[in-house]
Structure formats: C-alpha cells, structure tokens
Amino acid sequence: MIKTNLEKNGLFISVKILAVFMIIFFGIVLIPKYGAADPPHIDEIVNRLQQVYERTQDFQAGFIQETTVKSIRKTDTEEGVVYFKNPRQMLWDYKKPKAKKLIINAQKAWLYLPKDKTVYVQESDKIFKSEALIKFLSGLGKLNDDFKIQYATPHATDKEGNYLLQLYPREKGASYQYLQMTVAKNNFHILQVSFDDVMGNSTHLIFSGIKMNAGLSSKLFQFQPPAGVSIFKMP
C-alpha cells in the first residue's frame, strides 16, 4: 500500500519549495566572505544572489532530509543526492532508508517508488505553476520582486557566527510562509534549511559535498518507467 500522505503529497507538494530553495542556494554558496561581526547589508546579499544565479549552470550535493507529517505526527529521516541544472531540471535521488526518485524536467515530473513498483507522473507546469518560480527557473526572475529577504530576528547569526536568513514569498497563495537558512560564515555554503508548508508539515535539510558547474548531462533528468510498474497520472 502506498503511503500517499508522505510519499505522494509530501514530495509533489513540497517540490515547489525545494525548487525555490535550490535557486536561492546557487547564489549563497558563492557570496564573498565577510567577518562574523560585520555581516553585509541585506541588499548586497540579494544583489549577489541574483548575479550568481544567472551564471550558475548546475549543482549537486548530498543531503539529509527530516520530514514531519503533521496529520500522522511522524518524522522520517532520509538521505540522498540532489542535482539541479538550468533551466527547470531537478533530481532528488533518495538512497536511505529506501530508494526513490523525484525527477523533473521542462515537460514532466515523475515520482518513482521502486519498492512499490509505482510511478506517479504529472505535467511539470503543474508543479511549477508559480509565475515567479517559472521566471526563476528560466533565469529571468528577480529576487527583490519575488521575495522579501532579511536576517532572522532577534539574531542574524548563530553561536558559531553563521548567518541566519529568512526569505518571505511576495506571491499570494504560496505553499510556505518563509524559508529559514543557516549559511556558513567561512565559505557561505548552506548548512541547513527549514520550512513549513501550508498543511503544517515541516522539512529540515542538511547539505554536504557541494559541487558547482560540474557539467551535468541533461540525460540525468530524463526518466523511462521500468517494465512492470504501475503508473498513475496526477491531476
């Protein structure tokens, strides 16, 4: 039996948030260094995010994801590798505790659950239905137009001096209230990101082994359902 709340809804609904996160991630990892006692003005951060995203081609990293589903009061911890390539291509390749893949390109989005021999498929435009998100994934979006970005309050840094940022979507009806990120003070890699979706489910991500502009092939973001699997079309 497929656990639809966790597998189908949890991944397909939150993918919009994950996609926005990957866009912001591209910029933060390459921002110049600043002293912990002298954080840059937030406008400088935003401008740099925009510049770096526009010239970033691809990204990959290992991740640990903790997802709490409010309706069943359950927290699952998963591990895998995430890949992103401009424009509009993503792969979340989950390895532990069980394998699954979320593959997205400009045409389709697939959620493949090998153990259940099941594939869910949806038109990618229905995943990326936010106008702001589509603009970003096409390299045309403007951070200041689509997000209000600020340092977290009451503290802009954690006890190690890492930067704490909050990103609020300007779009009405967004699937989340805001994203909160912990950004390393020494190299501006993202250490953690957290968000709650509109249903009260929470996600916490930790990244490692970051590789930028490695020349990822677009073939990585193609998917052919294996023989013998059940395929379900999502509305």
Where does each model-flagged region fall?
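Gly/Pro-enriched, hydrophobic low-complexity segments
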Residues: 145-235
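Short beta-strands and strand-coil junctions in structured, solvent-facing domains, enriched
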Residues: 69-71, 98-101, 111, 118-119, ...
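Extracytoplasmic
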Residues: 56-58, 77-79, 87, 97, ...
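N-terminal leader/targeting segments and the immediate start of mature chains
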Residues: 2, 29-74, 225-235
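Flexible, surface-exposed loop/linker segments and immediately adjacent secondary-structure boundaries
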Residues: 117-163
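An acidic-aromatic
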Residues: 81-131, 203-204
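N-terminal secretory signal peptides that target proteins for export/translocation
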Residues: 1-13
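Bacterial N-terminal signal peptides
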Residues: 16-29
